[in-house]
């Protein structure tokens, strides 16, 4: 409880904090001054080592979860029983439980935690920023999660950690030479770091390829909603555009998602008799130059009958209107 000035009472009163609901309440009039307060500090927990609570001591909960660990660093820890501790279970039972837990716990995560500690040691020795440390840990996590690469104990682990730090430095444009990194890498030479750096490069390229394919679909879906909203496109066209974008993914159209989407918006709107959008307006909204949209339309024209939904327009209308606009572009180009 603390004393503040209530907005309703207009006088200093005791404010009560209800931790269950997160509300701050005036003790005089009951006015809720603040609602749904979020407590960002760590929770207080109480742990006792015996039944009589003689040495009960509050302790903070551990650190935040680690996003680079599969478990998020949420683990169960069973300690060996203390000589003075008393419990419902006997010491033999607790010892048995302790041994069983050690047999089933995830030793792979112990190894990656060891790698994170090694990276922390290296970045501290090189006086590197926490951003480098975080990126190097992310690289090691991807290395361990890749199908063809796994962490190994010993010198190889140190080489992987050193290569991850080196890669992170290059990505973030911080100058640390292989010689400097090798000096803090516990016996790992520059040749080993260079070798593991090449492996890491392949792992990251593989990961980027798999991510970009899924992100392209997600980003295109978001772009469809945003572009259609800005262009004030009718509901019928809004239904046709995402369907056309999805069908276009089945063809070898070597254009980035924005260019493909801009071209499809132009094609769909141009087929429409009532809601045509100028290519210049589409280009401004999509942040794509007009010539790029025109070239994308030309690339997609051979597949137009399979891309444009048949419920939106018949084949003759699609061919007639798109062929007409492409012919006009070519004529204007030759006449210049």
From Swiss-Prot:
Q: What happens when the gene is disrupted?
A: No visible phenotype under normal growth conditions, but embryos of mutant plants display a reduced rate of endosperm proliferation during the syncytial phase of endosperm development.
Q: Where are the TFIIB-type-classified zinc fingers?
A: 2-34
Q: Which GO terms describe its biological process?
A: endosperm development; syncytium formation by mitosis without cytokinesis; transcription preinitiation complex assembly
Q: From which domain of life does this come? A: Eukaryota
Residues recorded as binding Zn(2+), renumbered to this chain, are 6, 9, 26, 29
Coiled coil ranges: none
The UniProt keyword set, sorted, is:
Metal-binding, Nucleus, Transcription, Transcription regulation, Zinc, Zinc-finger
**What is known about the tissue distribution of this protein?**
Specifically expressed in reproductive organs and seeds.
Q: Which GO terms describe its cellular component?
A: nucleus
Q: Which InterPro entries match?
A: Cyclin-like_sf, TFIIB, TFIIB_cyclin, Znf_TFIIB
Gene3D superfamilies the UniProt entry points to = 1.10.472.170, Cyclin-like
Compartment annotation: Nucleus
Recorded GO molecular functions are: TBP-class protein binding; zinc ion binding
Query: What's the stated role of this polypeptide?
Result: Plant-specific TFIIB-related protein involved in the regulation of endosperm proliferation during the syncytial phase of endosperm development. Does not contribute to RNA polymerase IV or V activities in reproductive tissues.
The record, for PANTHER family, names: PLANT-SPECIFIC TFIIB-RELATED PROTEIN 2-RELATED, TRANSCRIPTION INITIATION FACTOR IIB-RELATED
> What is the protein's name according to its record?
Plant-specific TFIIB-related protein 2
The species is Arabidopsis thaliana (Mouse-ear cress)
This chain is encoded by the gene named PBRP2
């Amino acid at each position: 409880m603390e004393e503040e000035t209530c907005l309703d009472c207009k006088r200093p009163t005791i404010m009560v904090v209800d931790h269950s609901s997160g509300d701050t309440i005036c003790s005089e009039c009951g006015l809720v001054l603040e609602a749904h307060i979020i407590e960002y500090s760590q929770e207080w927990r109480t742990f006792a080592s015996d039944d009589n609570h003689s040495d009960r001591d509050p302790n903070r909960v551990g650190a935040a979860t680690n996003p680079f660990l599969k478990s998020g660093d949420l683990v169960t820890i069973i300690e060996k029983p203390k000589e003075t501790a008393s419990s419902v279970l006997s010491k033999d039972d607790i010892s048995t439980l302790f041994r069983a837990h050690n047999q089933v716990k995830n030793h792979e995560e112990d190894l990656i935690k060891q790698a994170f500690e090694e990276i922390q040691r290296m970045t501290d020795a090189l006086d590197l920023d926490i951003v480098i440390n975080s990126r190097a840990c992310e690289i090691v996590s991807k290395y361990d999660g890749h199908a063809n690469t796994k962490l190994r104990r010993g010198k190889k682990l140190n080489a992987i950690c050193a290569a991850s730090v080196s890669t992170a430095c290059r990505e973030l444009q911080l100058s640390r030479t292989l010689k400097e990194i090798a000096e803090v890498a516990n016996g790992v030479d520059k040749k080993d770091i260079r070798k593991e750096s090449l492996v890491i490069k392949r792992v990251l390229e593989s990961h980027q390829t798999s991510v970009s394919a899924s992100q392209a679909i997600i980003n295109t879906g978001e772009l469809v909603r945003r572009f259609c909203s800005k262009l004030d496109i009718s509901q019928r066209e809004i239904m046709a555009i995402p369907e056309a974008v999805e069908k276009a993914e089945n063809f070898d159209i070597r254009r980035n998602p924005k260019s493909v989407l801009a071209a499809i918006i132009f094609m769909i709107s141009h087929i429409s008799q009532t809601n045509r959008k100028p290519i210049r307006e589409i280009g401004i909204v999509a942040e794509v130059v007009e010539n790029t949209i025109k070239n994308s339309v030309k690339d997609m024209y051979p597949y137009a009958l399979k891309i444009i939904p048949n419920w939106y327009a018949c084949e003759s209308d699609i061919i007639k209107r798109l062929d007409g606009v492409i012919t006009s572009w070519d004529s204007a180009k030759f006449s210049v």
